[in-house]
Amino acid sequence: MASIATSASTSLQARPRQLVIGAKQVKSFSYGSRSNLSFNLRQLPTRLTVYCAAKPETVDKVCAVVRKQLSLKEADEITAATKFAALGADSLDTVEIVMGLEEEFGIEMAEEKAQSIATVEQAAALIEELLLEKAK
């Protein structure tokens, strides 16, 4: 009997034998006898999905602060993956963004942590981490 180990959930069905892994990839095999084994692999197209650890509300507030600090128009798109540098922010602008975030959320960021922020998502995740610490 063939054995296949995967990290995704699997289900093995009776005749024709088919192994389904998740919803995006199907691997199947069939055999008439032990000596006649065939295996087919079909890769389905993948789509890029950006996942954000921070809450959407936090990301939205960070976007608003960034928009205000950099004097951006509403038409300028800012997402969780947006890098401050891509918006034209230099190191001084980043310091002003951090100060605006501290004021908006009522937190204080250590300089080492503040320097590691390069995207809206990183800022939002750090803010949520600091808010959790503050609540303790």
Curated annotation (Swiss-Prot):
Residues 1-51 form a transit peptide. It is found in: Plastid, Chloroplast. 4'-phosphopantetheine is transferred from CoA to a specific serine of apo-ACP by acpS. This modification is essential for activity because fatty acids are bound in thioester linkage to the sulfhydryl of the prosthetic group. SUPFAM superfamilies: ACP-like. PROSITE patterns: CARRIER (PS50075), PHOSPHOPANTETHEINE (PS00012). GO terms for molecular function: acyl carrier activity; phosphopantetheine binding. It holds the Pfam family PP-binding. Residues 56-131 form the Carrier domain. Keywords: Chloroplast, Fatty acid biosynthesis, Fatty acid metabolism, Lipid biosynthesis, Lipid metabolism, Phosphopantetheine, Phosphoprotein, Plastid, Transit peptide. Induction: By sucrose in the dark. Down-regulated by starvation. One of its GO terms (cellular component) is chloroplast. InterPro entries: ACP, ACP-like_sf, ACP_chloroplastic, PKS_PP-bd, PP-bd_ACP, Ppantetheine_attach_site. The modification O-(pantetheine 4'-phosphoryl)serine is found at S91. Belongs to the acyl carrier protein (ACP) family. NCBIfam families: acyl_carrier. Carrier of the growing fatty acid chain in fatty acid biosynthesis. This is Acyl carrier protein 3, chloroplastic. It comes from Arabidopsis thaliana. The lineage of its organism: Eukaryota, Viridiplantae, Streptophyta, Embryophyta, Tracheophyta.
